Amino acid sequence: MDASLPAHMRPERSFQGFILALQRFWAEQGCVILQPYDMEMGAGTFHPATTLRALGPKPWNAAYVQPSRRPKDGRYGENPNRMQHYYQFQVIMKPSPPNLQELYLKSLAAIGIDSAVHDIRFVEDDWESPTLGAWGLGWECWCDGMEVSQFTYFQQVAGFECAPVAGELTYGLERLAMYVQGVDRVYDLNFNGRDGDAKVTYGDVFLQAEREYSKHNFEVADTAMLFEQFKMAEAACRKYLDAGWREGNRKEHLMALPAYDQCIKASHVFNLLDARGVISVTERQSYILRVRELAKACGEAWIHTEAGGAA
């Protein structure tokens, strides 16, 4: 850890300092530090900086925080560490460097977790995202018996092989910060590193939203409207891609990114419908397949763009 930081910005003192320490570490490894994508998504992997940039031959190194929404995980703010909205810190490096695991351990040291003191283990757990048509060889990263990160080598995204293979790291920020700060309830996390009246906790920032969105996700969200929104997002995705393929200069105007926004939207709407309990087991698989087909179509368009590596 950087001893020159003011006390309130040290990663063991504040949630925001914790995030800044990770951003600084990965910036020093050559990653571009991106901002969160401005759409609702279930995981940081959905960010186009990972899903689309993992495809094609061009090198790409990026890191970013991404708010993640999983409507079914809400507990009305009553569970100490389970929420429908939380933060992930995502790192993608393509091609994957040979020392990625070593870099990960150094990143833990940067936030106050020394592998010489703590029991750090990598438990084999291959990763898969059915809605993204993606999978990879992976490991859960455990610290003193608690899962804190996921470590994956992407093999396939949107149904396409990843060549070169990209390495991805996903940090569960709240869980790691709770461990570093030594608190048992996420809402007790010190957010700004201050004391007394100046102290702002995670609960001060997010508890009211967690209560209200849990009610929204389980009880209030209009299911008829959501079904219609899914169909609209699905249709828009395909319409944008069709328009892109008709363009003369395909490498510049394939519409992969606007279309992928609609894929993200469809995925989130599906998650809301799932939380409302209005999708049967059979229908659930059908919806997952429909989102996967959108992701695949967007991935195909992306690899034909200049940014995606098309010649």
UniProtKB/Swiss-Prot annotation:
EC number(s) recorded for this UniProt protein: 6.1.1.14
A GO cellular component entry from the record: cytoplasm
GO molecular function, one term: ATP binding
Keywords, sorted A to Z: Aminoacyl-tRNA synthetase, ATP-binding, Cytoplasm, Ligase, Nucleotide-binding, Protein biosynthesis
Keyword match ATP-binding: yes
Annotated catalysed reactions: tRNA(Gly) + glycine + ATP = glycyl-tRNA(Gly) + AMP + diphosphate
SUPFAM superfamilies linked: Class II aaRS and biotin synthetases
Location within or outside the cell: Cytoplasm
Keyword Ion transport: no
Transmembrane segments: none
Gene3D superfamilies for the chain: Bira Bifunctional Protein, Domain 2, Class II aaRS and biotin synthetases, domain 2
Pfam families, A to Z: tRNA-synt_2e
Chief location category: cytoplasm
One Gene Ontology term from the biological process aspect of the record: glycyl-tRNA aminoacylation
Source species, domain of life: Bacteria
Assigned protein family: Belongs to the class-II aminoacyl-tRNA synthetase family.
PANTHER family to which the protein is assigned, alphabetical: GLYCINE--TRNA LIGASE, CHLOROPLASTIC_MITOCHONDRIAL 2 (PTHR30075:SF2), GLYCYL-TRNA SYNTHETASE (PTHR30075)
Quaternary context: Tetramer of two alpha and two beta subunits.
Name of the protein described by the UniProt record: Glycine--tRNA ligase alpha subunit
Provenance organism: Bradyrhizobium diazoefficiens (strain JCM 10833 / BCRC 13528 / IAM 13628 / NBRC 14792 / USDA 110)
